[in-house]
Regions:
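Acidic anion/phosphate-binding donor-loop and adjacent secondary structure
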Residues: 99, 140-156, 162
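Short His-centered aromatic/hydrophobic patch
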Residues: 69-74, 90
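Conserved acidic donor-binding segment of nucleotide-sugar-dependent glycosyltransferases
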Residues: 254-266, 273-278
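Conserved donor-binding/catalytic core segment of Leloir-type glycosyltransferases
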Residues: 159-177, 183-186
Length: 313
């Protein structure tokens, strides 16, 4: 079986695709599937149409049995050809705007199978099917999420012994991730021993080292699909404070050291205080395994879906 994975062009990453797409592809490869990648270049909706010829050339070269497009707009490029069956994964951005939702949903009806990374994304899609779909979050590569003993990690990173370090789950400038809410909550604590770090421009291994060293991972986000950064924090057994959006509450479960906060800065302050007082590691990694959200298991489910589609041809 040969599968071509498609996503939006991101020049700052290897193979010009978001890391989780590559990680999923490599996990699929372990199940005996031949995998290749195609990045949709250009800006704006028109680029998804104009890239059709480039995609057809890639199809001619690679001869895939199936195409798996990540994000609805990439799915538009994929279904502009009818030679190869298409699976499309919706991650969240498809439902954030009216026109994006309409376009992504409309073109998704031309795919053979839909994957939604969380139930709320299926619920929000304007046009949806009653069958040939699954709710399946992306998995976490436990081989990449390496746990380092906390004190060793802190020494290697040069962390100060009298500081409490919080890793914010995104770039400070990303308004959707909502750093101002975290800052407002921390300011209410009136503590000078807290330092917040930005998750930006870091490799998976760097993130794992920081998560192993940090006292807390914070994600006061306004909107998500099924957040990979949160799953990585869980896989590194880092205490977590996060808002109840998307599937976050389900992911965190009732694991000790996981705290759900509201959008009230006072509640954020209270949960941050509790998480810092927890002063231990969680069993988040066990929770990831319990949910079946390792990359290997998610890849196995995808290969089963691919096989079903090809057997119906």
């Amino acid at each position: 079986m040969k599968v071509l994975l498609i996503g939006r062009y991101k020049k700052q990453f290897p193979k010009n695709l978001l890391p989780f797409i590559i990680e999923q592809g490599e996990a699929i490869r372990k199940w005996g599937v031949e995998v290749d990648y195609f990045a949709v270049k250009g800006n704006g909706l028109l680029s998804y149409y104009t890239q059709r010829n480039s995609l057809m050339q890639k199809i001619k070269e690679f001869q895939p049995d199936l195409i798996h497009a990540h994000y609805g707009l990439s799915g538009i490029t994929a279904v502009l050809q009818n030679k190869v069956p298409v699976v499309t994964t919706f991650h969240n951005g498809e439902t954030l705007s009216f026109y994006g939702n309409i376009l992504s949903s409309l073109f998704s009806l031309r795919t053979k199978f839909m994957v939604y990374v969380a139930q709320h994304i299926y619920d929000l899609a304007y046009l949806k099917r009653k069958k040939n779909y699954v709710i399946l979050p992306c998995g976490v590569d436990l081989h990449e999420c390496v746990i380092t003993e906390k004190e060793i990690a802190r020494k290697e990173l040069g962390f100060l012994p009298d500081k409490k370090y919080i890793l914010f789950g995104g770039a400070f400038a990303n308004l959707r991730k909502n750093y101002p809410l975290l800052k407002e909550g921390i300011d209410l604590l009136k503590r000078d021993d807290i330092e917040v770090l930005e998750m930006k421009g870091l490799s998976r291994l760097q993130i794992s080292k920081i998560l192993s060293a940090c006292d807390l991972f914070a994600l006061p986000t306004k909107s998500e699909g099924s957040p990979q950064a949160l799953k990585e924090a869980m896989a590194c057994n880092c205490p977590i404070v996060a808002t109840d959006v998307a599937d976050i509450k389900h992911l965190l479960g009732d694991v000790e050291g996981h705290y759900i906060c509201t959008f009230d800065p006072k509640d954020v302050a209270e949960k941050v205080e509790k998480a810092l007082a927890f002063n231990s590691r969680t069993k988040g990694r066990e929770r990831i395994i319990e949910l079946g959200l390792t990359n290997d298991l998610v890849a196995k489910k995808l290969v089963e879906i691919y096989t079903q589609i090809l057997n119906r041809k």
